[in-house]
Amino acid sequence: MSIISPQDVKRLREETNAGFGDCKKALSAASGDFELAKKKLREMGIASAEKRLDRDAKEGRVFSYSNNIHAGLLLVSCETDFVALNHNFVNLGNSLIKELVESGRSFPTASQELELKNLAATIKENIQVKKIFITEIQSNEFVKIYLHGEQSKIGVLVKLKVDDFSKTEDKMFQNFAMDLALHVAAFAPIYLGNDDVCPNYIKEQEEIFAKQLEFSGKSESILKGIVAGKIKKHLAEISLLEQSFVKNDKVTVREMLEEISKAISSKIEIVEFKYLRIG
């Protein structure tokens, strides 16, 4: 039987980031063979990672990447904010989103899932890909991405269509694109515009508001007006184009869009946006 020295365990630990006890166990099982011990650690880790899947993973971070063809956001969860700052966790997340964007895929491959399991085994936390958003970029479209804070707990992607694409170099346009991404991060709209809201959802909200006013004693015509007003206000809260702009609450996002379009002499449209948040 091979004698496993503390130096051997230390070396394996430095190379794999696995725990001291696990390294010692793996080296013993591998009779001191380092490569076999690494394989043992991966096997042990993947088995234990499966057991951790039912543990809460309420922390994590959002990763992003963009090229001239695609852009995307990736939300990877973990159990602690300490791990969310771990360089191995961050490096893997950045690598995954880059590979996804460059391939145009919106799902991880088997090898990428194995990488995640291996990392979960090393760090000993439940690590999972929760959300992936990949979008194609057309020749007249501009993408702005914003990640909030050191831990990137909020990620925003906004895609704009610009008639005269040369105007995307304009400082006013650049500032607006950044402000728009900040706006989405701050107000978390659900829909782009009122036309995108599901009719059944609006009907359900109308019924809720009507129920709240059921015993108000007001006439039916007045109640209809009140409900309509409440619906309008509610839609303005959840639809990006109807929200008050983050840098000027006297105008809506729609109005600001028209103002900037006029200022740079090129029509700007919001094609789509995505908001991802940890927790």
Curated annotation (Swiss-Prot):
InterPro entries, sorted: EF-Ts_dimer_sf, Transl_elong_EFTs/EF1B, Transl_elong_EFTs/EF1B_dimer, Transl_elong_Ts_CS, UBA-like_sf
Q: Does the keyword Cytoplasm apply?
A: yes
Location within or outside the cell:
Cytoplasm
Can you name one GO molecular function term for this protein?
translation elongation factor activity
Output the Pfam families linked to this UniProt entry. EF_TS
Recite the UniProt keywords alphabetically.
Cytoplasm, Elongation factor, Protein biosynthesis
**Cellular component GO terms, alphabetical:** cytoplasm
Q: Does the keyword Calcium apply?
A: no
Q: Where is this region: Involved in Mg(2+) ion dislocation from EF-Tu?
A: 80-83
Major localization class: cytoplasm
Q: Which family does it belong to?
A: Belongs to the EF-Ts family.
PANTHER family given in the database record: ELONGATION FACTOR TS, ELONGATION FACTOR TS, MITOCHONDRIAL
> What does it do?
Associates with the EF-Tu.GDP complex and induces the exchange of GDP to GTP. It remains bound to the aminoacyl-tRNA.EF-Tu.GTP complex up to the GTP hydrolysis stage on the ribosome.
**Protein name per the record:** Elongation factor Ts
Which species does the entry assign this protein to? Borrelia garinii subsp. bavariensis (strain ATCC BAA-2496 / DSM 23469 / PBi) (Borreliella bavariensis)
